[in-house]
Amino acid sequence: EGSGNAVITKLDGLRKLGIRTPEILRPVFAVMNPELTYTLSAWQTASGITDMMAHIMERYFSNTQGVEIADRMCEGVMKAIVNEAPRVMSEPDNYDARANIMWAGTVAHNGTCGVGCEEDWASHGLEHEISAIYDVTHGAGLAVIFPAWLTYAAKHNVGKVAQYAVRVWDVPDSDDL
């Protein structure tokens, strides 16, 4: 992860707290080797992929207007994740799939996709409360929260949700969306 953020869990107080100190935490460089991810379990891989998508969606579903470049960057990275995730899950030692997922994860977490956008991290805050109390992997908790969150988002910005469906998931474009 290339962000300036971290999360600390305090087990005896059932608290999970985020800290943001980019000047200290953001790495200056990283050596990324997809082969080092081959032994990750399917569960951890899927949870990481879910977290990547969540980080991008929390930037993508912005109330900020006129950010087509950011939107297209988000859509491109999400589309790559959608394409590569099944390959990573079915072929855990596929170097190219792992490399693409690794790069997508870096971009998802380093803020590149959200430049100029108002961001909404409420879903992450909700998940932190869940995983502070229960033994839940972060990405798995987000997988539970995001369908409801997306339903909520559709009520407030149906056009953006339709755009997401068409551009990321290849749902046929329709005036009925």
Regions found by a protein language model. Name each.
Residues 59-177:
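Active-site segments that bind and position negatively charged phosphate/pyrophosphate groups
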Residues 1-69, 163:
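A glycine/threonine-rich phosphate-anchoring loop and its flanking beta-alpha core
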